[in-house]
C-alpha cells in the first residue's frame, strides 16, 4: 500500500511542520468538564507522530478517549498531512481492527505495530487547514459527502477545528442528508482542549 501513496513534495512549507508539531500532543478538556460536568465529559485527544517511513512524510495516529477509560478509545484514526501551498490537506484513514491498537497513543510499542496495511482511506472526509495568524482553522472538505450513519439515519459530517500551539477547539456535528438538520454532536458548543503534553519532538525533520 505504501507504494501507491503519492510521494511527499520536494519542498514542504514551514506551516505544515508547524501544524504537525502543534497537533502532536495529549489534549484534555479537563477545565471545561470541571466547570460544566453536566454537559461535558472529561475527554483526551491524543495525536502521536508516526515514523517518516509510514507515509514517506508526516503522519499522525489519533485516539479520543474518556478520562475514566483510557484503554478503550471511542475514536481512532490515522492522518496524513499534505502540503497544498496556501492550505494543509489532511487525509483521514480508519483502522481495520481498531481496538487491536488501543493505547498506541501512549505506548510506542503498540504504535509500532500499526502499518499501512492496517488502514483504509476515508474518502470525502479529509480536513483542510489554513493558517490565520497564531492559529490554524480547519474543516471537513466541501461537498457534504463524509457520510456517517447514526441510529438508522444517514448524516454528513460538519466539522470545525481551531488549533494553536497549546489549544485545540473542535465542534463535530452530524447533519441529516435530506433535511440538513443536526442529528448528533454537541448542542452545547465546541469542545475546548488544552495541551497537557507535547510530542512535537517526535515529528520527523523534513525541511
UniProtKB/Swiss-Prot annotation:
Keywords: Lyase
Gene3D superfamilies: CpcT/CpeT domain
Enzyme class (EC, first level): lyase
Induction entry: Induced under green light, it is part of the cpeESTR operon.
Keyword Lyase: yes
Entry annotated with the keyword Flavoprotein: no
EC number: 4.-.-.-
Pfam families for this protein: CpeT
Annotated GO MF terms: lyase activity
InterPro entries: CpcT/CpeT (IPR010404), CpcT/CpeT_sf (IPR038672)
UniProt record similarity statement: Belongs to the CpcT/CpeT biliprotein lyase family.
Functional note: May attach a phycoerythrobiline (PEB) chromophore to apo-biliprotein(s).
Protein name: Probable phycoerythrobilin lyase CpeT
Organism, as annotated: Microchaete diplosiphon
Amino acid at each position: 500500500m505504501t507504494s501507491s501513496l503519492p510521494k511527499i513534495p520536494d519542498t514542504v512549507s514551514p506551516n505544515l511542520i508547524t501544524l504537525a508539531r502543534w497537533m502532536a500532543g495529549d489534549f484534555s478538556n479537563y477545565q471545561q468538564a470541571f466547570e460544566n460536568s453536566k454537559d461535558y465529559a472529561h475527554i483526551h485527544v491524543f495525536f502521536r507522530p508516526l515514523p517518516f517511513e509510514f507515509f514517506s512524510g508526516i503522519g499522525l495516529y489519533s485516539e479520543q478517549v474518556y478520562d475514566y477509560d483510557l484503554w478503550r478509545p471511542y475514536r481512532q484514526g490515522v492522518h496524513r498531512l499534505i502540503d497544498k501551498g496556501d492550505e494543509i490537506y489532511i487525509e483521514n484513514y480508519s483502522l481495520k481492527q481498531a481496538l487491536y491498537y488501543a493505547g498506541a497513543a501512549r505506548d510506542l510499542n503498540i504504535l509500532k505495530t500499526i502499518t499501512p496495511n492496517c488502514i483504509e482511506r476515508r474518502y470525502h472526509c479529509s480536513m483542510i487547514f489554513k493558517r490565520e495568524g497564531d492559529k490554524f482553522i480547519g474543516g471537513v472538505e466541501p461537498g457534504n459527502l463524509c457520510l456517517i450513519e447514526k441510529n438508522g439515519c444517514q448524516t454528513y459530517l460538519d466539522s470545525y477545528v481551531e488549533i494553536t500551539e497549546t489549544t485545540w477547539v473542535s465542534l463535530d456535528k452530524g447533519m441529516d442528508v435530506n433535511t440538513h438538520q443536526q442529528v448528533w454532536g454537541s448542542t452545547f458548543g465546541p469542545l475546548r482542549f488544552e495541551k497537557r503534553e507535547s510530542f512535537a519532538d517526535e515529528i520527523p525533520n523534513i525541511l
